[in-house]
From Swiss-Prot:
Membrane topology: Peripheral membrane protein
Main subcellular localisation: membrane
Residue sites binding GTP per the record: D18, H19, G20, K21, S22, T23, N135, K136, I137, D138
Protein family (similarity comment): Belongs to the TRAFAC class translation factor GTPase superfamily. Classic translation factor GTPase family. LepA subfamily.
Protein name, as recorded: Elongation factor 4
GO molecular function annotation: GTP binding; GTPase activity; ribosome binding; translation elongation factor activity
Annotated organism of origin: Caldicellulosiruptor bescii (strain ATCC BAA-1888 / DSM 6725 / KCTC 15123 / Z-1320) (Anaerocellum thermophilum)
Catalytic activity: GTP + H2O = GDP + phosphate + H(+)
Keyword terms, alphabetized: Cell membrane, GTP-binding, Hydrolase, Membrane, Nucleotide-binding, Protein biosynthesis
PANTHER family per UniProt: TRANSLATION FACTOR GUF1 HOMOLOG, CHLOROPLASTIC, TRANSLATION FACTOR GUF1-RELATED
PROSITE patterns: G_TR_1, G_TR_2
Residue ranges occupied by any tr-type G domain in the UniProt entry: 6-188
Catalytic activity, EC: 3.6.5.n1
Length: 602
């Protein structure tokens, strides 16, 4: 006897950026007739403008498609679109947990890249059935046979009968659909057991509140049930359940084991629906949650301050709105003597930070200034207390610190072998510890390094791309904390510390960094009528100094020839005045000066 679930296939598509993931999704949606040709547009599943422009997927999306296979049966596909970028690894792993299989898209001209590898390993950890697919075979530079061999050597998947497709031209897409039916196992699950559903994403809807995107593993969920979140114990009453068609929500009577869809339960904030959490029936709860849930901790912090005509309240409102859809974004109010009131924000990584900044500027039309990104340091004080510090101004004085540790990451870099030397040199400069090196075929190398996150946060990615002419790809994962010689560098302008410019830096690099900053500030701060010393110091020791010279009026202009004592008197008087000004004068530091220092490239 055939079970209802035997005709369901849950799968996702994994690929490196630009290998054609969203295009393949578009073709699959078109072939299964989910959208008419009139409604089709490129990258159907990427709903944010930024996603389309950068060609990346940030939020996971899910659609239900019906497909009539060659065996005459009608199948239900749930395609879950996952983000491919390293910052969103946890979201990817949750999306993968909602599937039974994955389509691995590899570009026939590029071969395997670092992020493909990272996501494939995630898929293997979840025991997914992986179907390799080779895309872009319509391009003259395609080399499908070599790429097949690469997939077999590097990942160990049998790619001998991998479908060769062109998502753009729509070649061989049907073969992929047939492989999905044939190779991906149907969901296992039991309608009669207590409800267990995995949240793999959530979205804030202005009318329905938060929609939790779920994959039901056991049981049934329908409206008017009381559900409970297993990590927080919060309870809600379901108001609507349904599934996704591209760009639409279709309400239905119930979601059963094996289904993918959404649950609306007038939930107020995304915080209550944490990605990876398990939803269960409050009256008949499951014994234990689905595995793999963890709280997301921000890794990178920076200050965001309003400038120009943007008000603090507007910035606060915008951040709150962004947070409705982005549970990983963290922010708290902070004030700085130099920049006024603003927020300290925490992000998953650099891309996440850039996207949030860009959305604030574009979607909410705000003018903001951001301080240099920093990471979370672990500080053990002499009395044994352990602090986690995300803001250099909160660092205790040096005599109270027993040791400081910084976050380390394991970086995997794939690079063509002619650039190995310069990439290794870059990693050495960034205090990387060499771990491993292996060759793919004869042309490409995988390098593994352990590196301080602080060194990557700054502009590692750009430096890597420029040293390898854009060919290197890069992926990192957090591995823990390691002790390090770190110092806090303060910048003093006319004897006063400017809090917005303080940062924590490695001892060996402190001097170079300090030198560059004071030189930059000297260019940026306009001359006043008195001289302004700019000093960089560690504790009370000044390690670099520049002076902005004073402007002076020519007081002797009116003395022709005249008596030398008269000239002396005027000069003395000017000197007195300058001295007095130096004591009471205020230094105006323009906004551009801050921007210039925060943007200092290595």
């Amino acid at each position: 006897m055939e079970r209802r679930q035997d005709r369901i296939r849950n799968f996702c598509i994994i690929a490196h950026i630009d290998h054609g993931k969203s295009t393949l999704a578009d073709r699959i949606i078109e072939l299964t007739g989910a959208l008419t040709e009139r409604e089709m547009q490129d990258q159907v599943l990427d709903t944010m403008d930024i996603e389309r422009e950068r060609g990346i997927t940030i939020k996971a999306q899910a659609v239900r498609l019906n497909y009539k296979a060659k065996d005459g049966k009608e199948y239900t596909f749930h395609l879950i679109d996952t983000p491919g970028h390293v910052d969103f690894t946890y979201e990817v792993s949750r999306s993968l947990a909602a599937c039974e299989g994955a389509i691995l898209v590899v570009d026939a001209t590029q071969g395997i890249e670092a992020q493909t590898l990272a996501n494939v390993y995630l898929a293997l950890e979840h025991n997914l059935e992986i179907i390799p697919v080779i895309n872009k075979i319509d391009l003259p530079s395609a080399r499908p046979e070599e790429v097949k061999k690469e997939i077999e050597d590097v990942i160990g998947l049998d790619a001998s009968d991998a479908p060769l497709i062109s998502a753009k031209m729509g070649i061989n897409i049907e073969e992929v659909l047939e492989r999905i039916v044939r190779d991906i196992p149907p969901p296992k699950g039991d309608d009669t057991k207590p409800l267990k559903a995995l949240i793999f994403d959530s979205l804030y809807d202005n009318y329905k509140g938060v929609l939790a995107y779920v994959r039901v593993f056991d049981g049934v969920v329908k409206p008017n049930m009381t559900i409970k979140m297993m990590s927080t114990g919060a309870q809600f009453t379901v108001t609507e359940v349904g599934y996704f068609k591209p760009g639409m929500l279709i309400p239905c009577e119930e979601l059963r084991a094996g289904d993918v869809g959404y649950i609306a339960a007038s939930i107020k904030t995304v915080r209550d629906t944490r990605v990876g959490d398990t939803i269960t029936d409050a009256n008949n709860p499951a014994d234990e949650p689905l595995p793999g849930f963890r709280r997301l901790n921000p890794m990178v912090f920076c200050g965001i301050y309003p400038t120009g005509d943007t008000k603090y309240e507007e910035l606060k409102e915008a951040l709150e709105k962004l947070q409705l859809n982005d549970a990983a974004l963290f922010f708290e109010p902070e004030s700085s003597a130099a920049l006024g009131f603003g927020f300290r924000c925490g992000f998953l990584g650099l891309l996440h930070m850039e996207i949030v900044q860009e959305r604030l500027e574009r979607e909410y039309d705000l003018n903001i200034i951001t301080t240099a990104p920093s990471v979370v340091f672990k500080v053990t004080k002499t009395d044994g207390e352990v602090l986690y510090i995300d803001n250099p101004t909160k660092l205790p004085p040096p005599n109270e610190i027993a040791k400081m540790e910084e976050p380390m990451v394991k970086a995997t870099i794939m690079v063509p072998n002619e650039f190995v030397g310069s990439v290794m040199e870059l990693c050495q400069e960034r205090r990387g510890i060499f771990k491993d090196m292996s060759y793919i075929e004869t042309t490409r190398v995988i390098l593994t390094y352990e590196m301080p996150l602080m060194e990557i946060v700054y502009d590692f990615f750009d430096a890597l791309k420029s040293r390898s002419k854009g060919y290197a790809s890069f992926d990192y994962e957090f591995i823990g904390y390691a002790e390090s010689k770190l110092v806090k560098l303060d910048i003093m302008i006319k004897g006063e510390v400017v809090d917005a410019l303080s940062f924590i830096v490695h001892k060996d690099k402190a001097y170079q960094r300090a030198r560059r900053i004071v030189e930059k500030l000297k260019e940026e701060i306009p001359r006043h009528l008195f001289e302004i010393p700019i000093q960089a110091c560690i504790g009370s020791k000044v390690i670099a100094r520049e002076t902005v010279k004073a402007l002076r009026k020519d007081v002797l202009a009116k003395c022709y020839g005249g008596d030398v004592t008269r000239k002396k008197k005027l000069l003395e008087k000017q000197k007195e005045g300058k001295k007095r000004m130096k004591q009471v004068g205020e230094v105006e530091i323009p906004q551009e000066a801050f921007m210039a220092v925060l943007k200092l490239e290595d």
